Structure formats: structure tokens, C-alpha cells
């Protein structure tokens, strides 16, 4: 039996330690999978924060933090696992360091999780989590990993394991890249710049399309009236609809939560039939390749470092130990008799070590030539593996260093172009992790073959950084920073991410199982989503795509300090309806101009950096995905009631999460309007209302998610001054944010009396693990 702390060690040896009585501190991230397979003998179940075993492959609700004194925390660190007052079911409660029922012991040898308060074992009762006396059933058996196996919240492809006759991968695709609901989902060859092939699995198991913030994978019509065969299509994101929720089992099948025995597959021959429809049906077997899927990127390194550590073959005595020490000494010129300790060394040549070990002969002091040969062959193999693993990370570090160097040199130029004072104390939202993730998205979107290799390494390093940040390691910081500190902020985060990659590499190089599995990935075909084979990659193209994506991310940070969007509803006059700084749709016209002057537009050099590099005008002007510009309601040359628009302020809620939200604004109890907010989109409150006389006016805003769970509450303070545009801010002390969410720096822009536009305020909401 091992103490919880030992799960993080690079050893599979077990030991028993006395639990401490001090207050706990979260240290290590883990996930626990039950060996119970469910009624279909396929579905894996993971310990979940919902108090029910959910088979959704979701990271946050199935990731826990293990403290060194035996507490099991939720991933947010807000609650711990406890036994209910009835002594049977478990529940999530606040930490009580005096309660022994909040202390658990994980026995990795016998796959058990035991409660120290009552001695019972974690169990399953009708898919509810409970504790029971030892019974030998599979429901009491658990395997633990360093984190849940499928990262959620990242964009990528779902590719079939079945390739066509030309060895091309095909993936889930929205027919004709249509944003319309009830559009068929079919198989298409994976190709660049096809948003209809890019998806994101959310924390609750929805599969969200990159085409639109409310478009998800859904069950379509029945095939010939069958109750076990359905087509797939897209639909609007719905609350608590199991037909829209999915999971990935250990057979790489994507199953439906409402029909857990049915999985996604396809009918037809890839590359031959004109249309190959995706279906929801019963696989013929667990190995039916038409029902097996690969995520791209696979985050293969994330999976490897999540596995139970496997130590190197041990040489502890006799000629085996003598052979190991002899080879270590001659290879390192007597620097050390433990050559494995240098696999992570920066200033050592493993290639030189390999040459010496390969040419070594058994000395007379070692009697067993067989033992010497066995050790020699093992160390040769380890060195070969270590050399290739190091090369992969060296290439990634070179790519990442070049990316940051170019981005840093461009930052000053961008600041001048956007007219930003980089010495000011103005706050900006600078989510570095999102910026880097957007680079990986661009790589897989524009270079599906090759770009995924960089994303596999980079995103796994991000995940690794989040994992080890629980052990007081400094991960990437996010959200708010002063402009004067932006460069330092970016540099610190760059160094942290480089350190994350270095730490992950060192962990792999000190573990025989991880090293072996990583080495194997280096020889997969380049188009394999799990591949780390860098031979033949077009690094120039990869660098160009990444550089543009990073520059766009920097623009997203800087632009809201100088510019905002001016929206005029359809039917009213506007100075421009299209062009470099304008966009129109059925709702009205959006114009980008400076915060102070609605008639001062951005230079063409700036807009060229947007539209010439593939930025979607709709996403930009709607503040979707990485864009977060505040929006002012504007009526040009109006003398009627709209001429008082400068007295008002209109809020925009930006949803950076994978769950739809809604917000309502009220004034003295009167509901002004409810607005839905799509995932990764912003929603602008565009209803005209009456504000009143000079002075402060307060409007309450409540934000809930689609399941009506509270997200945030705050009060908007609108201050009217004589012959001035209104001032807007969040009332001090009014902001309340629920656990699991974070609110970034609100963007507050004053209205204008002379130019007749309203004040604007954008409130960004992020998911916080």
C-alpha cells in the first residue's frame, strides 16, 4: 500500500506510510478509472465530481488533486471527497482537517481506494459512488492515472482509424461547412482550413463545431425507422440533453450518453463513394475499425506521462551491477558510475556515450560475459532512445524560441501601429495560454499533417505545466496585466512554458516505460496523429503559420486598448457599410474606430494584417473566439430620442468557455432583457432603455450557464455628467464569481456627447480549473 504522495514518484515500488494530521495542501493531479465495465461490457467509468459515474471523457470533472495527507480534492481545490452522514454514499464538502472520513488511501497494488474513517472501500451502487466493506467485486477495483486521459477544451479533428486506399485520413465533417442546424455529418478527407472538420469536446461531453459557438454534434433521423441505427447531424447546443453528450471508451469508440451501446461509425467506402454518411449504430465488435477514432492532435505525450511509472531494469548486485558501473565510468571518463543520471544532462554528448558503450569489451574483473552483454545491450538501447527523444524536444525548443523571439520583436511595431502606450499602467487581458493554444490551433488547421506534431508536443507541455503546477511549480499566468508589464509578463510565461517542456522531457528520460513509448512515436508515419517523426517536416512553413498566429494573438491583446466596435441597427444611416473597417449583416452595421472618436478608423496596414491573414470578419466584429472588443451602440445624425444615446452604456459579455451562457440586466427589479451567449462568442446588450438624470445609475447583471447554474453577478455603474458622454464601470465590491470561473479585466469606454455614441463595457469570463 502506498501513501498518496508516492503516486507522483518515478517508481512502481509500494510502501506504507503513516498519514499526517496536518491540514492538507493539493499536490498531485490524478484520475481514477473503475474496472467495472457497465452493462455493455465496454464503457469505462471514471470517478467524477458529479457524484455519479460519468463515462464522458472529460478532463476537469474527472481530474482530482491528491494531498500528501490523504485528502482528495476536486480539480479546482474547493471541495474534498467525504463519506455522507449516512456512512454509505460519498459527497463533496469543504475541507475539515479533523475529519478522518475525508482521508483516503490508494492501494495501487490491489487497485483499491480505502476510506480511513470507516475502513470501507470506494464502490459503485447503481452508478452512484459509495463506500462498502471489501467484497472482491470489480466495482471496488480502480486504476489511477496522473490525470484524465482526454484533454477537453482544445480544438482538433476526429479521424477514423480506417484510411482510404491512398493512406489518407478521413474525419467527421459538417456537410459543406454549413452553419445551419440539422446539417448532415459525413466523412471527408482531412484537409487544411476546413472549420467543418474541427471540433472541441467540452467538459460535459458535447462535441462543439468550430463553425459556430452553438453548433454541436447530435443524433439525426432514424435509418429506415430503426431504433438502433441513426444518421448524425448538427443542432443547437441544448441543456441537459444526453443525446448531445458523448464519451470515448478504451476501444477508441465514441459512444452516445443516451444510447451508451451505440457508437459513431460510417457506412460506405472512403475515397470511393461520393458521400459517406456518419451513423450511430452498434459496432460489430470492439475492434470494428469503422467505429474507431483518433483525435488529432492525440496529445500522445500527455498520455505517456500520465501512465504508471516504469523504472529502468535494476542492477543492484554482482556482475550486473559491476557491468553497469564499469560501462558508466568508461563512457563518462569516470565522471559517474550511474550513466542514467546524465540522460537529462544539458552539456553531455549521449552520442559519444553510445559509441564508447557499443565498442566496450568485458573486463577480466567481470566473470559473467552474459551479464555484461545484457547490460551493454540495455544501455545501448537506452542511449539510442534517449538521443531521439532529446532531438524531438530540441527541435520543439528551437521552434518555440524562434516563435517567441519573432513575436517579441514585433510587439513594439504592433504597439506603434495600434497607437498603444506601452509605458502606461492600463490593464489588458493577456491570457498567454490561450495565445499559445491559438498557435497550435492554426498549425493543425492549416497544416493537418505536420502541424499536429508540434501541437502534440506543445499542448502536452501546457497540460504538463498545469499538472505540476499543483506541486508549487509556476505555470503560465493569465488574464490581467498592465501594459508596462506586458513584455515581462509574456517573457515570464514563455520561460515557464519552456521549463514545462524541459520538465516533461526530463521525466520521460528518467522513466524506461515513458522513454520506450516516446521513442516508438518518433518512427510513426508523419501523417499519423500520434507521430513525433520530425523527419521531412517543412519547418519553414510551420514557423510562418505559427508566427502569423502569434502576431494575431498579440493584436487581440493590444487592440481593445485603442479601438472598439460601433454598432448601428439595420435601417439606420451609417457612413460605411463595408470595407477594411466595416462589416454588415442582417442585424446592422459594425464599424471599427478608436475609442475616443467614432470617425477615426484604423490604418490599412493594420486591417491588412487581419483580413490578409485569414481572420474572419464576422468573428472579429462579433468579438468571437480570441477577439474581445467592446461594442458601443451608435446612431449617426439622429435628433430624436436616439440622440440621447450618449447617456447610456451597453454591456457585452464575452464567453471564453465551452458552455453557453445567458445574462439578464435589471434595474430596480425590472428585467430589461435576457440575452444568450454562445460558447467562445460575445453578446452585446443592444436594447435601447431609459437611464434618467445626471448622477449614478446602477444596473444589475446576472450571468448563468445554459443549465441555469450561476456564473457571475455584478452591478454596472453608469455615471452621467453634464454635456458629457456617460462613464461606465463595475461597481466596487459588487462582483461575485462562482468557483470554476474567472472574470478578466473589464474594458470600460466612455460615451460621447458630441459624436453621439454610448459608453461600452466588455466583461470577459473564463473557465478557471
From Swiss-Prot:
Pinpoint the Ricin B-type lectin domain residues. 25-145, 158-296
Which intervals of the chain are annotated as region Disordered? 1-22
Q: Does the keyword GTP-binding apply?
A: no
Q: Name one GO cellular component term.
A: nucleus
Which molecular function term from Gene Ontology is one that the record holds? carbohydrate binding
A Gene Ontology biological process term? sorocarp development
Subcellular localization, per the record? Answer: Cytoplasm; Membrane
- Pfam families documented for this protein: Ricin_B_lectin
Q: Which InterPro entries match?
A: Ca_Up-reg_Membrane_Reg, Ricin_B-like_lectins, Ricin_B_lectin
Q: How the protein sits in the membrane?
A: Peripheral membrane protein
Induction details: Induced by high levels of extracellular Ca(2+).
Q: Function of this protein? A: May play an important role in stabilizing and/or regulating the cell membrane during Ca(2+) stress or certain stages of development.
What protein name applies here? Calcium up-regulated protein B
Instruction: Name the source organism.
Output: Dictyostelium discoideum (Social amoeba)
